């Protein structure tokens, strides 16, 4: 996983959207952990932290921590939220993901409603 490339491309997207559609809000999710990709989890956490830092500096970008809800109390990836490939979410995983995104999206959007 090339962290710098991923973040650079995200920054380019943010810049392009700001230039061409300046009132457009951008929501970026943390990289989702998975058992099948534990070998890149440290890099994924780093990318997520950098996405969060970008959002802190740009009022049109909101970071949603969609990774933490998939971790157990010890910080390990939960095992019962994936289908057999240990990458894609099962029904319970998708429910967690959807609720997490909604919880991050709704408060961020409400400030633009008034």
What kind of feature is each model-predicted range?
Residues 1-114:
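Alpha-helical cap/lid subdomain in secreted, periplasmic
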